[in-house]
Amino acid sequence: MLAGQDKSVNDSAVKVKWGYKGDIVPERWGKLTPAFALCATGKMQSPIDITQKIQIVPHGLSWQYQSAPMIIMDNGDTPLNLDGHQMIINEGHGVQLNFKDSPPREMITFLGNPYRLVEFHFHSPSENRWHGQSFPMEMHFVHQGKAGKVAVIGVFVKAGEANPAIQQIVENLPKVEGRPFTIKGKRINPADLMPHGKAYYHFKGSLTTPPCSEGLQWVVMADAITASPAQIALLRKAMGGDNARAVQPLNHRQISFSAEEN
């Protein structure tokens, strides 16, 4: 965020503040309100540390992303239908890009099911880890499916060459919180923010922010994309610094790995 890290979610018409600093840090989310109880008691929480390939499965991911108008906002809300429950999620991510649902062109197909891209946002440092390794940043692409299904694609971002698609974003960072801005004459294609390799890890998980609802399909791409240190620094500044939840216990979940399609 531009002006700090406090966030809020509607809880019975009461704004419940949560964040990443002070007495409302992730470790305390589950105690802030009963609506956030899963943050403390859930058994399928995200993020996780991807430490092993438990099961190798056939590849089941494809995307049909297309260029779309650039709608960017800071500290915005995301409407989701999760297992039949309509909810408005403020993910505490600071910078997000929204995608309109008509026409539903920004799509993926995962395990035979279609999902529509709702928004993508940034976390820094990365929330998911790979064999204990953290990355400077991670992008989450949030997709809505039928019958209350939600799928999130996580893409690690490492420091390296400047990223032209991310440059579009840093050049148009909003200066006012909570309002979507359509950048006139600018379009963005989410496919430009995906790695060239299509291998991925898959596991069941949750929202990484309150209310930490479970039942999400998580896909984390095996390859990272790059952004320049300057691009990462500008996005971190816009987000107000760190906005990452610590990794959560895997418990009895399986992690599957799918190699790139031939």
Give residue spans per PLM region:
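Alpha-carbonic anhydrase
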Residues: 1-262
